[in-house]
Each structure stands twice: as C-alpha cells, then as structure tokens.
Curated annotation (Swiss-Prot):
Belongs to the COG6 family. It comes from Aspergillus fumigatus (strain ATCC MYA-4609 / CBS 101355 / FGSC A1100 / Af293). One of its GO terms (biological process) is intra-Golgi vesicle-mediated transport. It comes from the Eukaryota. The lineage of its organism: Eukaryota, Fungi, Dikarya, Ascomycota, Pezizomycotina. This is Conserved oligomeric Golgi complex subunit 6. The keyword Membrane applies.
Length: 752
C-alpha cells in the first residue's frame, strides 16, 4: 500500500519541530504556531492501527488516489460528486421499475376480467349439465357394482368349487397318483381351510356344505393314497438307491393323517421283517422258502463248528443288512423329516384322538423314526440271531472262545448303539447276549476250578517247586484272554484307571484268582517251611510276570501280589539268615549271649526289623559280662569247635546260601535275599565279636580289682600291670579272643 504522506513529510515535520522554537522575522504569530503544533501533535498521535482508519485507507488505495496536495484539496468534493451521481443512477433505475409495475398491474386487471367471464360461462354450463351428470353417475355405480359382484362370483367359483374332472382324479382308483393328484389335493385342502372364513358370516349354510363336501373328498383322497403306498411298498426294492420321489412325496402328504401314516409304516415294517428274515435264512442255509440259491456262496451254517467265526459271520451279515436298510430308508425320514413333522403336527389337529397325551407336545424326529423303523424291520432277524447264538454258546466248552465271543458281541453292541441308538432292540439284544455268554464263560471257569479241587495229583507241587502245571495252563489261558481284551476298544478305558476296577476285573476274578488260590493252598502239601515259601514265591512270581504286561490287569491285581511277595521275601530272608547262623555255628554263640544282650535275642529272626536287619547295638553292656567266659558255649573246646566250623563254612558260604534257594526261579530275587541275609549275619558276628572283646576286658578289670584288694593269689597269671591294662603278651593270647580270632572285616571280605 502506498503511503498517503510524501516521502519528505517526516523530515519536514522534524525540521518544523526543530525550528519552531526559533523566532524569525518571517515566522507566524505565536497563536498560529501553537494551533499548527497542536494539529500536528493530534495527527501524529492518531493510531493507524484502528480498523476504521485502515479500512478507509484501503478504500482510498483501491480508488487509485495519489497523495498529492491537489488530491487532498479535491478529495471531499470528489467524494460528494460520486455520491450524487450514484444517487441519480438509483433514481433512474427505480423509475424504470415503477413503469414495469404499472404495465404488470394493467395485465393483471385484464386477466381478472377474463377469469370472471369464464367463471360465469362455467356456472351456466354446470347448471345445464347437472341432471345429465347425475344420471350418468348412477349408471356408472350400477355397472361397477355389477362388475364387482361378477368378480366375486367368479373368484368364489374358482376358489371354492372343484371341477368334476379334478374330483375324479382325486378319488377314483383308476386314476394314477401323479403331480396332478397332489395339486388337486392341495387345492381341496386349501378350500377346506378357507371354509372357516365362510363360517364367520351371518349365513353359514354355504360354508358348512362346502366344508362337508371337501372333507369327504379329502378322506377319499387319503384312502386312495394309503392304498397306493401299500401297493408300492409291496414291490419296493430297497437295493435301488433311488427311491421314487412320488413315494417320498406321498409319505409327506400321508403324514397329515397320523393314523394312516402309522398304519402304512406298520405294514411296511411287517413286509420288511418278513423279507429280511427270509434273507437271513437264505444266508444261513442258502435256501429261501425251499428254493435253490447261489452255490458259489457258502452258507453261514457251514462254519457252525467254529463258534467265533459262526457268530462273527452272522453279526457281520446283520450289521451289513442294518446299514443297507438304514441308508435306503434315510431318504424317506431324514431328507424329508421336516415336511413329515409339519404334516403330523397338522394332522393332529384334524385327528385329536391320535394324541396319547393331550398335554404333551408331539414332535417328529426323522432320525428317531428311521431308527425305530429299522429296529422293527429286524425283529425277526434279531430273534433268529439270538436263538442261534445262545445255542452255539451253550454247546461250546472252550472258555477262551466264549470270551472272544463276548468281546465280539461287545464290539457289535457299541456299533449298533452308534448306528441305531443305545435303546435300540439290536443294542439291547447284544447286551443280553454279552451277559449270557459271559455267564457261560464264568460257569466254564468254575467247572475247571471244581475239577482241579478234586484232582489231588494235579494239586501236588512239582519236585523242583516250580509253579504247578494247572496254574501254568490257567496263566496261558489268561494271557489269551488279556490279549483279546487288549485288542478291543474297552482296553483304552482301563488304561486311564489306576487302581479302580475295570471291565477286565470280573475276568480276573474267575480266570485268575481261583487258580492262584488253588496254587497257594497246594503249598500245604509240602512239609518244609522253606519249600513252602519257595513254592509260593515261584507261583506269585509267575503270576506277576504274566499280568505285568497288561496295565488293565496290573491296575487291580499287581498290588496284592507285590504285597504277598514282600511278605514272602521277609520269610525267605529269615530262612537264609537262620541258615547262615546254623551252618556257621554262630547261632550257638548268639543263643548263649541272649541274657547279655541289651535287647531281645539278636540271633532270632523275630528280633529283626521289617528290612531284615538286626536292631542297632547299644553301647551300654550288662555289668556281669565277665561271666560270658564261664558259659558252656564259650569254653575253649566249644569255642574252638565253633571257630573251626566257621572257618570251614566261610569259603563256600555264598554258594551254599544260594544253593539253599536254588529252586527259586528268580536269580535276582535269590541274590537280593542272600545279600541282605549276609549283611544281617555280619552284624550278628560283629555283635558276638564285641561281646567276646568286652568279656575279656571285663575279666581283666575284675582281676585287677582283686589284686588291689589282696584277693586270692591263684589267679595272678591273669593280673594286670600297674597301669591297669592287660598285658599284650602270652597272657592275652589265652583269652577268648585268642580262641575266636576271626574279625568282622575278615567276614565281610570273605562274604563279599
């Protein structure tokens, strides 16, 4: 923006302010000088930041005004001139507008006059045509009413009246069941339903007559449909996977009459029951109602000598037939299940007597209906199957085969439960046959046990004390049973259980526990306790090795066997310990030392702890320990004899001890028992050694005391020195220690 002040204005202003105080001959008077000064001060003090001043300056800048002296003098005049010119132009424009408004007013007046004339003409015309229009309106209304009545009549006839041709298609037995039949049936059902609307009017006669007629036609149509379905069911080939769509549609429609629908299903079930029973008889004997069959396929009866194969073939045939029957009927009840359910629900309203329980809501389950129908189709087959399985099981005496049949029945029970439901006839029959076969298995095992109980020769333990032959045979049978169970689906459930009973536990109770009890009770035939313990241990070890390979058997029977083996191990440990004491002669010394022991006799096995070790020694000894040397067993001749017996025993001690349990069939078991018995023997020897040393020291103290008291001089050969200790020379060699020189360290080395 250009400045409105000349470039020299500021300098001139400074010059004026600087020179104003000076007095010159040419300067104006003082009053004028003050006025100018005030004016300048006012101008200079004005704020050019004011918006009004800024807008005014911008307006001047847009007009192209230059800040000159001439412009400043003419500025007011120029502005006033422009204002006058603008006002004059506005006045001229308003004059033109006034002229146009006058012309518009003239036109409007002319239009008003014309409209008034037209209004008068219209009034006169209306007065002239009013009678004609009224007459025409009355005629039009009459025509409209007539057309409406005709339309209603046509619609009523079209909707509620069924032609004779259609009724003939619906009720005549000569007419086929096709799409036209179903279309006419749908129309009659709609007419019957719509008659309810007619019953809501004042005149109900027409509605009642139409409803009665439609009801008769519907009943005739459903009867015709029922007979047609029965006829089709007689010739229905379920082997053909493509069941006629007309049959499926007919069943959906017939479901609206529940009584006819269920009668139709009953007829179908009876027909299929006869057909499947005949087919099963054909599969068994290769003849159907006396007619010849295919010679290339062997009848199932050919394998009747093998119960497992015979039962398996029959069950396989029944399963295959059940699957085929279910797949063939699935299109009828699963694919169209919703439509059938709707039809049954609608039919219950027309047949209220079909309800068994009025308060119960009836719903159709297609899969349940399918399973029920398949069950009914197989009633005859199930009856024949049960009779044959019961006969073949009753005539068979092999327990393992019976148990395999039990598992076969269990497998098919689970299969039929998944296929037809847990409450199906086939599943129930499989469960009944499973219980029957297992009862037969139990009776066979009980017969074996009773036979063995009366066979004294079979119960006699072998000379080598191994498990008896009958028990090995029973374990072999049990192994076959466990392998059969392990290969089945039920074994998976047993693996998840720890000590709880599983499905194999009843088998162990009849096929294992009685034979184990017989084997254990037969040990009473042995007169020797060692032989009885070894024999019983061999029996339990054999049993444990048999059931340990199967988790479901170990879950319930391993702990009792392990507990019994632990008890027998303690008994064998005591036997080995007693053998070492008797063979070495150390038992005589331990028996003699019983009164001097700080606790009950150490040498007796009963004094040992549960681990077979002797009780810990007590440092405190009886005060009369010196009297040990006076005992008969510790006299020189007897003690020397015991020492000699010990020396003769030690070189072959381990071999002899192992040979003492040579009939025990587990080498590791023999080794562990012998090692613990040797350890107990070493502790006993350490006790005897300590008692001998203690007796020598006690006798030495007694002799020293006697010398100090001036006692008898006849024992001065054994007097101690002045220091109170027994001499280490020839005098000490005459003590008990000299007669029994073996040390515990030597014993441990020789027995290691």
């Amino acid at each position: 923006m250009e400045s409105y002040f000349p470039s020299g204005a500021i300098a001139n202003h400074s010059f004026i302010r600087a020179s104003s105080p000076a007095s010159t001959p040419l300067s104006p008077p003082t009053q004028r000088s003050n006025a100018l000064s005030n004016r300048l001060t006012s101008v200079l003090s004005a704020s050019y930041a004011d918006s009004d001043i800024r807008d005014a300056l911008e307006t001047l800048s847009l007009r192209g005004v230059h800040n000159t002296a001439e412009t400043r003098r003419q500025l007011r005049l120029d502005v006033q001139k422009e204002v006058v010119e603008c006002n004059a132009e506005i006045v001229r424009d308003f004059g033109k507008v006034a002229e146009q408004l006058q012309r518009i007013g003239t036109v409007i007046s002319s239009l008003n006059q014309t409209c008034e004339e037209m209004r008068q003409h219209i009034v006169r015309a209306k007065q002239d045509t009013a009678p004609v229009i009224e007459e025409a309106s009355a005629l039009m209304n009459q025509k409209k009413e007539s057309e409406t009545k005709q339309q209603l009549l046509d619609a009523f006839v079209k909707h509620f009246i069924v032609s004779e041709d259609d009724l003939l298609v619906l009720t005549s037995a000569e007419e086929p069941i096709d799409d036209r039949f179903f279309n006419v049936l749908d129309r009659v059902k709609q007419v019957h339903h719509d008659c309810e609307v007619l019953l809501g009017g004042e005149n109900q006669r027409l509605g009642l007559e139409l409803m009665e007629k439609s009801s008769r036609n519907l009943n005739s149509a459903y009867q015709k449909l029922f007979r047609w379905i029965q006829k089709k069911f007689k010739s229905l080939n379920l082997e053909d996977p493509r069941i006629s769509s007309s049959i499926r549609r007919a069943l959906r429609v017939l479901a609206e009459r529940p009584s006819l629908f269920h009668s139709c299903l009953d007829f179908f079930a009876d027909a299929r029951d006869y057909a499947l029973s005949d087919a099963f008889h054909y599969a068994l004997t290769d003849t159907v109602s006396g007619s010849g069959g295919d010679r290339n396929v062997k009848p199932i009866e050919f394998s009747a000598h093998d119960p497992l194969r015979y039962v398996g073939d029959m069950l396989a045939w029944v399963h295959s037939t059940t699957v085929s029957e279910r797949e063939a009927l699935e299109a009828l009840f699963v694919a169209d299940g919703e439509e059938i359910a709707k039809g049954i629900q609608a039919g219950l309203s027309s047949e209220p007597w079909s309800r068994i329980d009025e308060g119960e809501e009836v719903s159709f389950d297609g899969r349940k209906a399918l399973n029920d129908l398949v069950n009914r189709d197989l009633v005859g087959v199930s009856r024949a199957l049960r009779q044959r399985i019961e006969l073949v099981i009753q005539g068979h005496d092999e327990p393992v085969t019976c148990y395999k049949v039990v598992h076969l029945l269990s497998f098919y029970r689970a299969t039929f439960s998944r296929l037809l439901g847990t409450k199906s006839n086939l599943a129930d029959m499989m469960q009944t046959l499973e219980k029957f076969t297992f009862s037969r298995f139990e009776s066979l095992m009980l017969e074996q046990v009773n036979t063995l109980s009366n066979d004294h020769a079979a119960l006699t333990p072998p000379d080598d004390l191994s498990a008896p032959e009958f028990f090995l045979d029973a374990l072999e049978e049990l192994t076959s049973l466990m392998k059969t169970h392990d290969a089945s689906l039920e074994a998976e459930d047993a693996e998840s259980e720890s000590t709880a009973e599983n499905k194999f536990t009843p088998v162990l109770r009849v096929a294992f526990d009685p034979f184990l009890q017989l084997a254990k009770s037969s040990a009473a035939e042995l007169p020797d306790a060692t032989a009885r313990a070894i024999y019983t241990t061999n029996v339990l070890l054999t049993a444990r090795s048999t059931i340990s390979a199967f988790a479901f058997a170990s879950a319930t029977h391993m702990d009792p066997i392990s507990t019994a083996l632990s008890s027998l191990r303690m008994e064998l440990l005591e036997i080995q310990h007693r053998y070492l004491l008797d063979a070495s002669g150390l038992g005589v010394l331990l028996t003699a030392l019983e009164p001097f022991a700080p606790s009950p006799t150490i040498s007796k096995p009963e004094s040992e702890g549960k681990d077979g070790h002797a009780p810990p020694q007590v440092d405190k000894q009886p005060t009369d320990i010196a009297e040990i040397a006076d005992l008969p067993a510790f006299q020189p001749e007897a003690l020397i004899a015991v020492g000699q017996q010990l020396d003769d025993f030690l070189p072959s001690a381990l071999m002899d001890a192992t040979d003492n349990l040579k009939h025990l069939q587990s080498a590791s078991f023999v080794q562990s028992v012998t090692e613990e018995a040797v350890e107990a023997f070493c502790r006993d020897f350490e006790f005897v050694e300590g008692m001998i040393i203690g007796a020598d020291e006690a006798r030495g103290r007694v002799h020293i005391k006697r010398m100090e008291d001036g006692s008898d001089a006849g024992v001065q050969d054994d007097v101690a020195t002045e220091s109170g200790k027994v001499s280490d020379g020839d005098e000490q060699e005459s003590k008990l220690r000299r007669l029994f020189p073996r040390t515990t360290g030597e014993i441990r080395v020789l027995l290691s």
